[in-house]
């Protein structure tokens, strides 16, 4: 019987935070999709999710008048298409029969989530003194430099999970929950979008748990987890126990908006 996994691809693995070297990003994407086909050949069924931090921030800066959640939905289509067409090419080249499908995915959040009050999710490129920045932007220092940060509430429910389950049960490769999913809240019995970017690792963990999959993979643009980052005591960790991960997370080794959500998501799973 086939095993199933959720494979979360980082937005920075698809496009660098500085916004350059798109040719290199395309090569990385092709390598990731080749890895996905390797998993299929090893007997796994694969659900793909992806980030959108660099891409959604760039689009938001082009037209700030559009609601943030609409830009999230736009990146689901744009990045989903890129993943799909790259994956399709590799599938055909390696004589694989699987179809793939991109699902526009809505994710319910709590309108009173503290994430709306304390923005932590980096979006867009690394900022410099030459770039135009709005006065109402929240800016935070990341490991690569200053970036805009936006609200990032916790995912409560994946509204389109039944469609995802149906497709994976037909042995399709499902691309879903792009950019953490389109954030919506329930008002008067109806769903409405809200301005936020849900962390894709948090929703990937939620998806993995609700789908009852066998494994969760979170890929990153870095080679390993580190504690004491950028200090003399920096240490590389190739493996961590759950207890170690909890200890380091609690002590603040993994910052919000970076490695923190990844470690927390893997602990939850």
Which residues does each predicted region cover?
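N-terminal glycine-/serine-/threonine-rich phosphate-binding loop
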Residues: 1-49, 58-60, 166-171
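Short beta-strand segments at enzyme active-site cores
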Residues: 6-8, 45-58, 99-104, 174-177, ...
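Polyanion-binding loop/helix "lid" in catalytic or ligand-binding cores
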Residues: 27-37, 68-86, 90-91, 151-168, ...
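Ligand-binding beta-strand-loop-alpha-helix segment within the catalytic cores
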Residues: 64-174
């Amino acid at each position: 019987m086939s095993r199933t996994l959720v494979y979360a691809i980082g937005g920075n693995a698809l496009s660098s935070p500085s916004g350059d070297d798109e040719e290199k990003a395309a090569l990385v994407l092709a390598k990731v999709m080749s890895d996905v086909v390797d998993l299929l050949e090893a007997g796994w069924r694969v659900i793909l999710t992806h980030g959108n931090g660099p891409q959604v921030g760039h689009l938001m800066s082009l037209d700030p008048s559009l609601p943030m959640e609409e830009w999230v939905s736009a990146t689901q289509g744009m990045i989903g298409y890129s993943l799909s067409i790259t994956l399709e090419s590799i599938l055909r080249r390696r004589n694989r029969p699987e179809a793939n499908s991109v699902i526009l995915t809505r994710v319910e959040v709590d309108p009173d989530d503290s994430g709306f009050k304390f923005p932590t999710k980096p979006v867009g490129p690394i900022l410099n003194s030459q770039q135009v920045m709005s006065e109402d932007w929240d800016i935070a220092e990341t490991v690569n430099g200053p970036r805009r940060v936006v609200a990032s509430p916790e995912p409560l429910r994946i509204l389109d999970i039944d469609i995802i389950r149906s497709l994976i049960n037909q042995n399709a490769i499902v691309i879903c929950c792009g950019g953490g999913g389109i954030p919506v809240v329930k008002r008067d019995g109806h769903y409405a979008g809200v301005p936020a970017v849900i962390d894709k690792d948090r929703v990937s963990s939620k998806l993995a748990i609700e789908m009852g999959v066998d494994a969760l993979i979170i890929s990153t643009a870095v080679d390993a987890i580190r504690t004491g980052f950028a200090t003399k005591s920096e240490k590389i960790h190739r493996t961590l126990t759950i207890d170690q991960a909890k200890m380091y997370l609690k002590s603040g080794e993994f910052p919000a908006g970076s490695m923190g959500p990844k470690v927390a998501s893997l602990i939850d799973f």
